[in-house]
Regions:
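Conserved ABC ATPase signature
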Residues: 12-16
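Hydrophobic anchor residue at the start of the ABC signature
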Residues: 26
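ABC ATPase C-loop
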Residues: 29-30
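Catalytic Walker B motif of ABC-type/P-loop ATPase nucleotide-binding domains
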Residues: 37-41
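ABC ATPase "signature
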Residues: 96-97
């Protein structure tokens, strides 16, 4: 599921790096044939070089028709795979819409994304 892991298919999981073990765990979940996939912060603890690989796979799964519910704090990653975004603060929905809806909302981008904030 991840080319980087295929290169290490003969290794035992305990010999993989922490990020590779996280990718292995994520890969096991991604291999299910579910209609809905819930993924909680898949890039957490991954080296930057591994993050792109993970999000490429998530995007491929989403484009295959699987509904992906993704919890992620890094909006740059969300932009890559999301059709819709829900911002939640303290359990309450702050904004729901397309990625463009969120990015075009000046108050939301200033508060949550740190964009357009006057210093």
């Amino acid at each position: 599921i991840f080319p980087r892991l295929l290169e290490r298919k003969e290794q035992q999981a305990r010999t993989l790096s922490g990020g590779e073990r996280r990718m292995l765990a994520l890969g096991r979940g991604l291999m299910t044939r579910a209609d809905l996939l819930l993924i909680d912060e898949p890039s957490l603890g991954l080296a930057p070089v591994l993050v792109d690989e993970v999000y490429d796979r998530i995007a491929a799964i989403a484009s295959s028709g699987v509904t992906v519910l993704l919890v992620e704090e890094n909006f740059a990653h969300v932009r890559e795979v999301a059709d819709r975004v829900v911002l939640i603060e303290n359990g309450a929905v702050v904004l729901e819409g397309t990625v463009d809806d969120v990015l075009n909302n000046a108050a939301v981008t200033a508060t949550y994304l740190g964009v357009g904030v006057d210093e």
